[in-house]
């Protein structure tokens, strides 16, 4: 059982790291004066989905970490 949990922990860790790395940085400030604005709802929808996936795998990572630490 512990091997299955460790495998799921590794998978959730890898997906969490990749989902964090593919996030677009929220550039706010003086550097964005001449940059393009995002008016497309498709971009916002993708960003919202990516945020949900990131939070889901963060929760799974913390859950598996806690369970494995108790064992």
From Swiss-Prot:
It holds the Pfam family SecG. GO terms for cellular component: chloroplast thylakoid membrane. NCBIfam families: secG (TIGR00810). GO terms for biological process: protein secretion. It is a multi-pass membrane protein. The chain crosses the membrane at residues 4-24, 50-70. It comes from Porphyra purpurea (Red seaweed). Belongs to the SecG family. Keywords: Chloroplast, Membrane, Plastid, Protein transport, Thylakoid, Translocation, Transmembrane, Transmembrane helix, Transport. Involved in protein export. Participates in an early event of protein translocation across the chloroplast thylakoid membrane (Potential). The keyword Thylakoid applies. It is found in: Plastid, Chloroplast thylakoid membrane. InterPro entries: SecG (IPR004692). One of its GO terms (molecular function) is protein-transporting ATPase activity. This is Probable protein-export membrane protein secG. Its main location: plastid.
